Amino acid sequence: GEKNMAAEPLYKASEETLNLPEKWAVSFADSLSYPEFKENVPADTLCCVQEISGWEKKAGTLRFEGSIRMDEAVHAELDLGEVFEIAEVFVNGISAGVRLCKPYRFDLKDLLVQGENQIKIEVTNCLGTALRDPISHYLMIEPFGIEGPVTLKKHSQNSDLEAGR
């Protein structure tokens, strides 16, 4: 019988997981200073501001910067897992897109090259963590940043589409 190609994804994530940067530089910009980032701190993982001393009440944009080396150009998907709230991913200065809600997945086709690759992730939240009115004092403050789990998986093209079937 005929196969419904519209129901098949063009690319399927393989089980091959690629390495993420081992170290990240985290910086912050509020709505007035963006795109100028300040207050740089190092981090071993992508995280939420609640894990950075003194940053607990920040509202604005967090920038995570790291680099990874590739032996060859690859087609991969970056899945950020849980993010609070808006995420944009850049690879080598090119935006891979913006996500406002789950799933926080980014197709990195044609972005990861052989050699060194600069990864930049910007996460923006609303002013709720910084400005507290009388009613919001009783509401739970959501985290700000990336809770994960974060994965980078190599893609393999759907063989049926590749063969034109």
Give a label for each model feature.
Residues 68-92, 119-122:
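Aromatic-lined ligand-binding clefts that engage carbohydrates, nucleic acids, or primary amines
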Residues 58-69, 104-106:
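Short beta-strands within extracellular/lumenal beta-sheet-rich domains
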